[in-house]
Amino acid sequence: SNMMAYLTMMAPRLKELHRVLKPTGSLYLHCDPTASHYLKVLLDMVFGAENFSNAITWKRSDTHNDAKKQFPATSDHILFYRKKAGNTFNTQHTVHSERTLRDWYSYLEFPDGTTRRMTKIEKETQVIPPNSRRFNTADMASPNPRPNLMFEYKGYPHPPKGWRFSLDTMKKLDEQGKLLFPASNNGRIMFKRYLDEQAGATVGDVWTDISQLRSSMVERMGYPTQKPLALLERIINAS
């Protein structure tokens, strides 16, 4: 059969890939659902089942209406194997969504230390003044009673259950400019969380944020199974 011929062709190639792969290296094999289960058996034999890492689902296209008797095929599989334990792997993160940026990071800080809320137009356009930093604020109150963390800081009273941080940590955060002080002593000190210091959500084994190449894309070279640069970048950055 065509599948047997394909697997017979793939087996020696996978063995050679395993041979030349560095001890810290990994293999990512892209395949569609018609062959992924057969290829996994081959890879388990070549790499060892203990070196299987993930079966990544890549959502490469949106749902279409040409499938009448089954669910439309919108995803492919990427089988991820390591050469052996100790392979290089770097956790990947998604970029922040527009909703996260709009709803959570609504303050700006300027080089002179002044801060203000973003305007409606700035939130809608996501265009902010040069050299400004976006941040949001986090409560510094302890969720549980902490008698040892009930102290006044720079004239500001502690929250009812105490601070979340020790006095030494408060001083360090203050030196780093990460405390936002209220206009009056009746307010509460807040922690500044800068956008440029926050990673997005951790990427899991279902990738929905990388679309397939379209004919209008500049990077398209005409190769039928060409992969998007964003897909290759994620794999390279991860391993």
Regions found by a protein language model. Give the residues of each.
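Core catalytic lobe of class I
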Residues: S1-S239
